[in-house]
């Protein structure tokens, strides 16, 4: 008996997205699951067929092979890659199916019981000086907090949750699966044993409400982009008495107009005049601690790098401060007066023919001569 097209099996178009495939498979798995159709051979076969189709189409490489070669591209008996349960991870989708089928008691425990609140993430932008020296900032974070009128219970003030009639208050029900009897989380109360018949009007029975929370964050010295500060218990409130989540403040350091940072070292470019580069001199350069004097030796070329030790960043995790590395950029003079041009022309004439004043140029021209001499 020939196999049906996998797209036909799932009831989707050939251009279906991953979400479309998952939705279609989930629907079929719910419909034909053997536990819902005990003793029905046809349903069992369709369930297996849907599994096989989803296993292939949810895998990018297998789907490409199927699109190009059909079943021959994925059937091991025809030399293909094979289709079954060996190469796919169905834990996420089976979790969804079992959650709906058994009311939250599928793999991993489902939705019932006290649950910890979600962790939150907040991106905090700092300038370089704040990141290097440390600071304290105030932030405003949207979150979910326990509803005050009902104290997080979800029930209207003055009322109390009722015993769940489905499970009798124990939060678990027994489901018959073929020859086995399995205990599952109650689908009505989600394991609480109680149901809310008169919900709180403030939170509509959710037990939590949205609120902005203002917090003070102490940022240690030396942080860098990507570092995280954990504020324990400042995330979303838990449900059904569960603990509160945490807040993670993620550092993002803005670009600086002068300095670039690489770990504990700082870098900057220092423009110097043509004459200072030739004759040498002294100039002031900025650091995060103020200005310092930098001595420029005569004959300094563009790209020369000077290291100011200890003028970088002290890492947040300890250790000595890094260095500040200043890269020199020699500026060619512009907007010259007549007299200045005359002086430069005199200098050029005096240097002409003497390669000792231009060591790099001398080496470069020697290389050019050798290059053309080899041609």
UniProtKB/Swiss-Prot annotation:
Q: How is the cofactor bound?
A: Binds 2 Zn(2+) ions per monomer.
- What S-S linkages are listed for this chain? none
Q: Where mainly located?
A: cytoplasm
Q: Which GO terms describe its biological process?
A: chaperone cofactor-dependent protein refolding; DNA replication; protein refolding; response to heat
Q: Which residues bind Zn(2+) 1?
A: 147, 150, 200, 203
Which Gene3D superfamilies does this UniProt record tie to the protein?
A: DnaJ domain (1.10.287.110), Heat shock protein DnaJ, cysteine-rich domain (2.10.230.10), Urease metallochaperone UreE, N-terminal domain (2.60.260.20)
Q: Where in the cell is it found?
A: Cytoplasm
Where would I find the CR-type zinc fingers in this protein? Answer: 134-212
Spans traversing the lipid bilayer: none
Which superkingdom does the taxonomy of this entry point to?
Bacteria
The record's Gene Ontology cellular component field reads: cytoplasm
Q: Which Pfam families match?
A: DnaJ, DnaJ_C, DnaJ_CXXCXGXG
Recite the UniProt keywords alphabetically.
Chaperone, Cytoplasm, DNA replication, Metal-binding, Repeat, Stress response, Zinc, Zinc-finger
Please list the residues that bind Zn(2+) 2: 164, 167, 186, 189
In the record, what terms sit under GO molecular function?
A: ATP binding; heat shock protein binding; unfolded protein binding; zinc ion binding
Quaternary structure annotation from Swiss-Prot or TrEMBL: Homodimer.
Instruction: Fill in the domain comment.
Output: The J domain is necessary and sufficient to stimulate DnaK ATPase activity. Zinc center 1 plays an important role in the autonomous, DnaK-independent chaperone activity of DnaJ. Zinc center 2 is essential for interaction with DnaK and for DnaJ activity.
Enumerate the PANTHER family for this protein. CHAPERONE PROTEIN DNAJ (PTHR43096:SF48), DNAJ HOMOLOG 1, MITOCHONDRIAL-RELATED (PTHR43096)
Instruction: Briefly state the protein's biological role.
Output: Participates actively in the response to hyperosmotic and heat shock by preventing the aggregation of stress-denatured proteins and by disaggregating proteins, also in an autonomous, DnaK-independent fashion. Unfolded proteins bind initially to DnaJ; upon interaction with the DnaJ-bound protein, DnaK hydrolyzes its bound ATP, resulting in the formation of a stable complex. GrpE releases ADP from DnaK; ATP binding to DnaK triggers the release of the substrate protein, thus completing the reaction cycle.
Under what name is this protein listed? Chaperone protein DnaJ
Ranked from the top, the taxonomy reads:
Bacteria, Pseudomonadati, Pseudomonadota, Gammaproteobacteria, Pseudomonadales
Gene name of the encoded protein = dnaJ
